[in-house]
Every structure is written in C-alpha cells, then in structure tokens.
C-alpha cells in the first residue's frame, strides 16, 4: 500500500544523474540552504536552513513524529546539548569517539585517512592505523591538495570540548548524539511510564562532531540535526505488538553473510536469522515506511547489515538504511539492537540503579548473581573514598564485572578496579521478581542527510527546456499550493487573495503570486516542489463556471476545474494520497 500511495510523484528514473553543484545552487538561490557565515568566507561542514529549507525540515520531523508519537505512542523529550564529561566517559565517547587523521607533510592539510583509500577498500573505516599507513605506501596515495607525502595516521577525537562555568570549571562537551540525553533520563522516563516496559522515547535536535575534513555538502556536517528513537525493551521479550501486521511486507536487505542485495519479507528475514529479532525487524520496516512516505524512491533504498568487524562490540545486530545518491550508496539512518550497554554503563559510572523490575506471577526461590565489594582491600587503598567506591561496585552489572575489571566514576574521576577488589557471588533468595537491565532498540535518523536525499531524488532538470522540477512528496513540500490570479485586475486579484488567505488560515502552506505569465509562475512553483497550483480566471467570477477555479497537478501537469470553496478540502485529500485524476 505504501508504494502505491506515493507512486504518483516518483516519476524520475534512475538513469538521470544529478550534479550536486546544480542542486546546491538551486537550494541556495531559492532559500533551502545557505553556507553558514558566507560573508566571512564560510566554514566547511556548516549550513543554515533558509525559509523553504526550514519548512521542508519541519515537515520531515512532523511525519516522523506522526509515526513514533502518533502510531506507536512514544513520548518525546528535549535534553541539553552541553553535557558534563562524566556522561561521555560512561558512554565511551571520551575514549573511543575518534576518526583516523593524517596530515600532509608538505602543506599540513588534514585529511580523514580512511577516506583517502576508499577506492581500494570496501570498508576502509575498519582499517587500523598501521594498515592505513601501509595502504598509503602500497597504493601511492598522496596529498589531494598539493601531492605531498602523507604523515603517520593518528586518532582524532570528534567531540567539541568546553568548560561548564568560568575558568577551569567542570569539563563538558557538545553532544555528538542526542541519545545520551535519553539514557541519563531513563529513571525519570521509567517512573513517568509507571515502571512499565516497553518504553519508547524520541528526541530531535542538534548534535556536533568536529569532522576532520567535511566534504560532500550536507552529507557530512559539523553541526547537524538528528531524529533519534530509543526503545527500552525487556531483554527476554523482543517481540512487538504490531509485528504480525507488517511481517509479510517486502524489503531489500544486504545481509553481512553475502553482501548481496536480496528482497524478502520481514518474517522471512527473522525466521532465517538474518535480522536478530522481531522488534528490530519491525523498526527496520518502520524506517522503510517513513522514508517512502517522505519521498525516498523504493528502487534506490536498501538496508545493509553491518559486517562483523564494523559492528559495535555491544550490538546484537545493526542495519543501515542506505539511499542511492550521486555520491553512491549513502547511510541516512541506523537501526540497532544496542543490548544493555548504555544503561549498564551509566548505572556503573553513576552508581545509580537503571534496571527494570520484572514481576513473576508467584514468588520463587532462585539463584541470583551479585557483585560484592572487598571492603578490607578498598579501605587501605582508597581511604575516605572507599565507602563510595564500594557502593558503586555493588551497583555494577555482574555480567560486566565478570570481565575482570570495572570502572566507576568518583567525583568526576574514572577509577578502574580489577577483580581483586570485588567478587561476583551467587546467592539463593525468594523473590517476587527480578531486576533486568532493559535492552535498547535504536532507530537513529540523520535529518540533514534525509533532507538532502529527498531533494536529490526529487530533482529533475530538463536541460533542453531549461526547466527544473522538484518532485517532492506533497506531505513534506514546503509550499502546498500556489494561488494565482490570471491577471492582477478586475477583481481576480481580490478573489485569489481571499482564497490564499483562507488556505493559510486553514493550515495549508500557500503563496500568492500575481507577477509574470502563468507559465513562469508555474515554473517558479515547480522549481521548489509545490505540488498544486490554483488559478483564478474570469470564469471564476461570471458565467456557468462562476465560483470555480482551476487546480493543476505538478507532476502530471493535468488541470481540473473545482469549486473554489472546496479547494482546501481537495488539497487535504490529495496530500493524504487521493488520486488527482479522480478528484
């Protein structure tokens, strides 16, 4: 049903190439996107949204909200963008959130090392520092700017560092993702949800990554927008209530076992063990539904499973939604089963219980594992801090403690403890339930990449006619209706203005345009993706057709005569998927 719903505007063919420079030129000229700080020469990887860009971006977010808040019943929060160091120490970003960097020994220009060898390796981001250095020599890779030799590869942390407060106060970072704000608020959200699972939470907002050498326009930005979803589920129940409704939907997958695209049903992917579980599969499919609804071409959309050596060590499974662009296949969304990693880490580093109490039907005797601190060893070693450290140890996850060491955070200082200071013991207790650390299913959407992908796949330029059309989905188009008087006289302009004002007040984004020929006005609207144009002519004011106007469909160029008083109703039906030919 989804593909039929949007087939009326997906009229471009895959054979038409798009020059990103032409598209970005249109975006700049018509107010979608502008380079930030352009009067000062601009800054790589930074862009501002113009009036039409803001409208398109907001419409994308509202469609996303309608699915996750409307259909799924998830809740939304808005958390801080500046976080203290402790948050990202626990999450692993302080130690691990880095890209590999190399500098030209001649001109000192910095480059992301793995990007320089993309033409030689399928997944260059998994190469080690040593392997990258060897690849430069093996393939004769030189500085793209001056041709000089490249220096040794190193790690470069991508977080923007700051101080919270004046002077050398508490260290903080601009968040590299919105997700951590949800994780650290888990207990608040859990109580809000009356201590029940599943618990779905969404957040949209800005994130920051100090990219080494951002290129490819909006594909890689230093300040970017995310739409993230964190679904907390019972680790022993990874089904989903609406799974049966979508299990027979087909989807294009690229499993890591074959690395070949194959179409199959969602249920087939789960039953064959290709997708780890039903809840993950459901939200892979939800991502497909969202992207198709936003206007992504199904023929240029696939879901690629992370290879074993690129998957995060804590992830049970991870899939990227990739779209085919002029740059090649590009990731715009990641859907992962993150296991209990996030809550376990924050529980361990903060000393806060972040579990879920799962009640049994009846109390039972069972063996449970607990972490027990060795107080006699902690006292001499840590003195006044020993009591606090012992409490943090005993709040740790037994599974993590079994690794032989745990890290706790004391007054902002990370303290690593080996198992000489604790032991994992098994005790028998009569319990009415058990505490489990929820697992997290995370669909993380790159809003700016989705924005750009929609525009590129919608872009259609006819060089012969010098005519550009953006075939945007009506639901996300920044302007829904262009309202034109045939002439700006004889009352046509007054009639058209009243129609325009009625549409605007009814929540249908419209523009009034009375200048130039009708053909030029259509062209202006087609160029920014406006799906419908309404014209008031002399027949609207007199004769048998009095009170009617013409409405034009952007993609088919078909025109129909309709009652002026029903234009708003008709446009709403069209935006909901009605066939223009049948109105």
Named regions from a protein language model:
Residues 1-13:
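Short, Lys/Arg-enriched N-terminal segments with co-localized hydrophobic residues
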């Amino acid at each position: 049903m989804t593909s039929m719903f949007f087939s009326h505007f997906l009229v471009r063919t895959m054979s038409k190439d798009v020059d990103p420079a032409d598209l970005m030129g249109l975006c700049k000229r018509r107010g979608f996107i502008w380079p930030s700080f352009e009067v000062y020469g601009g800054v790589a990887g930074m862009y501002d949204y113009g009036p039409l860009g803001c409208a398109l971006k907001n419409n994308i977010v509202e469609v996303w909200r309608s699915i996750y808040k409307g259909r799924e019943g998830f809740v939304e929060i808005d958390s801080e963008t500046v976080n203290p160091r402790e948050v990202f120490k626990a999450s692993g970003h302080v130690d691990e959130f880095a890209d590999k960097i190399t500098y030209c020994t001649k001109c000192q220009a910095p480059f992301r090392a793995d990007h320089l060898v993309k033409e030689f390796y399928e997944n260059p981001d998994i190469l080690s520092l040593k392997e990258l250095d060897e690849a430069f020599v093996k393939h004769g890779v030189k500085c793209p700017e001056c041709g000089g030799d490249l220096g040794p590869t190193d790690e470069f942390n991508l977080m923007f560092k700051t101080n919270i407060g004046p002077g050398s106060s508490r260290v903080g970072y601009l968040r590299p993702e919105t997700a951590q704000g949800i994780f650290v608020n888990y207990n608040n959200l859990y109580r809000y949800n009356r201590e029940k699972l599943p618990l779905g939470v969404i957040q949209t907002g800005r994130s920051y990554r100090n990219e080494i050498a951002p290129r490819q326009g909006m594909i890689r930005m230093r300040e970017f927008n995310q739409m993230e979803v964190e679904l907390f589920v019972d680790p022993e129940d990874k089904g989903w209530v609406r799974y049966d409704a979508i299990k027979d939907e087909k989807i294009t997958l690229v499993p890591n076992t074959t690395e070949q695209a194959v179409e199959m049903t969602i249920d087939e992917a789960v039953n064959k063990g290709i997708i780890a579980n039903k809840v993950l599969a459901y939200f892979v499919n939800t991502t497909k539904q969202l992207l198709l609804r936003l206007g992504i071409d199904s023929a240029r959309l696939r879901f690629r499973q992370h290879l074993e050596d690129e998957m995060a060590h804590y992830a049970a499974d991870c899939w990227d939604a990739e779209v085919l662009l002029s740059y090649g296949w590009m990731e715009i969304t990641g859907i992962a089963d993150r296991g209990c990693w996030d809550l376990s880490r924050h529980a361990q580093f903060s000393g806060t219980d972040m579990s879920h109490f799962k009640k049994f039907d009846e109390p039972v005797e069972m063996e449970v594992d607990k972490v027990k601190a060795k107080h006699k060893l902690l006292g001499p070693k840590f003195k006044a801090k020993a009591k606090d450290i012992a409490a943090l140890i005993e709040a740790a996850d037994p599974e993590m403690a079994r690794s032989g060491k745990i890290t706790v955070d004391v007054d902002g200082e990370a303290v690593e403890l080996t198992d000489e200071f604790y032991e994992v013991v098994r005790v028998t207790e009569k319990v009415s339930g058990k505490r489990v650390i929820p697992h997290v299913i995370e669909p993380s959407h790159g809003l700016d990449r989705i924005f750009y992908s929609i525009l590129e796949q919608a872009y259609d330029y006819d060089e012969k006619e010098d005519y550009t059309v953006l075939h945007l989905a009506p639901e996300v188009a920044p302007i829904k209706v262009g309202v034109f008087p045939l002439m700006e006289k004889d009352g046509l302009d007054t009639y058209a203005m009243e129609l325009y004002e009625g549409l605007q007040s009814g929540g249908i984004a419209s523009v009034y345009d009375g200048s130039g020929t009708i053909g030029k006005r259509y062209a202006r609207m087609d160029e920014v993706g406006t799906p419908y144009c309404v014209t008031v002519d002399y027949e609207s004011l007199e004769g048998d057709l009095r009170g009617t106007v013409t409405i034009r469909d952007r993609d088919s160029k078909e025109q129909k005569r309709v009652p002026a008083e029903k234009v708003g109703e008709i446009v709403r039906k069209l935006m909901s998927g009605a066939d223009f030919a049948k109105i």
